[in-house]
Amino acid sequence: MISLEGKVALVTGASRGIGAAVAHSLASHGVHLGLASRSGDDLGIEGAVAAPCDVRRPGDLESLASATAERFGGIDILVANAGVGAYGPFLDLPPDQLEEMIDVNVKGTLYAVRAALPYLLESDGADIVTLASEAGRRGLPYEAVYCASKFAQVGFTRALDHELSEKGVRCTNVCPGGVATDFAMGRGRTPEMPELEGMMTSEDVAEVVLFVLTRPRNHRILETAFRPVAEPSWG
C-alpha cells in the first residue's frame, strides 16, 4: 500500500453520492482536491479548489484542471465520476434523456481525461479511475442506452491503458453493482423495486477507489467489479 499524502486529485461529479464519498476519503488521506460539479460545492473540504462545472463543456473542465494544477503544482489522479441515468423500455426513452446520457457519461468522461491528461503525464505516478458500472460489463434490461454509455466508458479506459501504461499513467475501470444514492433512484425507478434492496453505500465504492489508488506502482488494476451480496452474480 502506497501513501497518497500530498497527491492531487481532480474528481468530477463531486457534489454528492459516490463523488462526494470519494472526495472525503481522499481528503482524509492527505490528497489535495479539485472538485467538479454543477453546483460548485467544495464539500467543506479545507483548501479544495471547486467551481461550477458542466462536464459537457470542455472549457469548464480545462479551467478547473488548470486552476487545480496551479494551486497544487500538478495533478496526479483523475476520478471521472460524473454520470446520469434513465431507465425503462428503449422506445419510451425521451430523446433528451438519451442525449444527456451520451453527453454526460461518454463525452463528459472523454473531456475530463483530455483536461487532466497533460498534467497527469507530468506526474511521477498518475492514475485515471473511471466510475463505470456493472452496466458497462453486461447488457441489462430497460437500461439499453445507459449500458451503451457505460460500455463506452469501459472500452475507452481499457484502450487508454494500452496508450498510457508505459508513460506512468494507470487506467482503471471501477464497476460497482447497485449503490444506494440519489442516482439509483433515477428516472423510471421507484423505492419498492426489489433491485433497490440491499444496495451498497457510496462509502463502499470509495473504499474500492482508495484500494485501487494505493496499490504499489509496479502493478495496476485494469477493472474491478463488485456488487451487493443480494444482487445476482450473473455467472
Provide a role label for each language-model segment.
Residues 29-44:
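Conserved glycine-rich Rossmann-like NAD(P)H-binding loop of the short-chain dehydrogenase/reductase
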Residues 53-63, 95:
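The beta1-alpha1 cofactor-binding region of Rossmann-like NAD(H)/NADP(H)-dependent oxidoreductases
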Residues 89-90, 97-102:
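Substrate-binding pocket helix/loop in short-chain dehydrogenase/reductase
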